[in-house]
């Protein structure tokens, strides 16, 4: 009896060890290759990719196209799943990865037809950057194909990553636009409902967008909102409650400030920005320094 239990225990231990080894090999194979020399088809000259102690990448190339091709490889090997999520979120294609749970999110974006509109106007969207974008796309697909194992997230989802396209690079930018804007148009819908039930002077105060501190790049600043006087708005005449408890929620907007050089000790201007973007893991920003001749 003891021999039987020992044999069963030994088999279980062996299964656990083999399973752990297979998982380790799969995860290890999906990691980016950070060392050595690699052939990257399409390069006109050799490119150097370096990382500092914090993992920040510096790419040194002989041309912009070569730098973008190398950047595409780096992005694919270290961030492809996140890139895939961004293009799919903009195009309304997340349910192809996650199933029915993502259908509602897809519906909110599909109404804009961003993939169809991007592909129909791709040349105009790329402008003079067509060569650089195509080099980047080739680098992305080469870097993805060069991974020993597809990124681990696809293993969990039992999916295969689809190749990158030039239109996907535009869609990732549109995904950030949707993150910073109101793709569901909820703000305008809410203002429309408010306008139907409040006096014009109160609506003008609520809907006013701007302050005396604004410095727009285009057009003139709108200034501060005008406070209605008693002849325009008498709160005592409003029906129903005049106040409600404010619900807690995400605060939309970013913190920015600029200080002129005339106000600093060494004469240099200061610009700071704290963008209120969604929290992601890994982070949205991927810092890279590109070095190539003008």
Q: How should these model regions be labeled?
A:
Residues 1-18:
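N-terminal Sec-pathway targeting helices
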Residues 285:
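Catalytic core of carbohydrate-active enzymes
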Residues 23-270, 275-281, 293:
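Substrate-recognition/specificity elements adjacent to catalytic centers across diverse enzyme folds
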């Amino acid at each position: 009896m003891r021999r039987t239990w020992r044999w069963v225990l030994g088999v279980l231990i062996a299964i656990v060890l083999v399973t752990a080894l297979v998982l380790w090999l799969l995860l290890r194979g999906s990691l980016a290759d950070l060392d050595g020399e690699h052939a990257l088809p399409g390069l006109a000259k050799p490119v150097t990719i370096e990382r500092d102690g914090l993992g920040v990448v510096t790419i040194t190339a002989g041309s912009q196209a070569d730098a973008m091709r190398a950047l595409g490889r780096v992005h694919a090997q270290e961030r492809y799943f996140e890139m895939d999520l961004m293009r799919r979120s903009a195009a309304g294609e997340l349910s192809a990865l996650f199933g029915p749970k993502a259908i509602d999110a897809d519906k909110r974006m599909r109404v804009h037809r961003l993939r169809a509109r991007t592909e129909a106007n791709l040349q105009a969207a790329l402008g003079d950057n067509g060569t650089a974008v195509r080099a980047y796309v080739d680098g992305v697909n080469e870097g993805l194909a060069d991974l020993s194992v597809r990124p681990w997230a696809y293993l969990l989802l039992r999916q295969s990553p689809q190749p990158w396209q030039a239109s996907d690079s535009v869609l990732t930018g549109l995904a950030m636009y949707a993150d910073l804007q109101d793709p569901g148009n909820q703000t305008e819908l809410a203002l429309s409902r408010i306008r139907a039930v409040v006096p014009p002077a109160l609506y003008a105060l609520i809907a006013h967008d701007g302050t005396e501190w604004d410095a727009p790049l285009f057009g003139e600043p709108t200034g501060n909102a005008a406070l209605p006087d008693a002849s325009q708005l008498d709160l005592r005449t409003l029906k129903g409650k005049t106040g409600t408890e404010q619900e807690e929620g995400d605060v939309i907007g970013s913190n920015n400030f600029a200080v002129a050089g005339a106000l600093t000790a060494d004469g240099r201007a200061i610009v700071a920005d704290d963008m209120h973007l969604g929290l992601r893991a890994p982070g949205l920003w991927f810092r890279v320094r590109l070095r190539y001749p003008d």
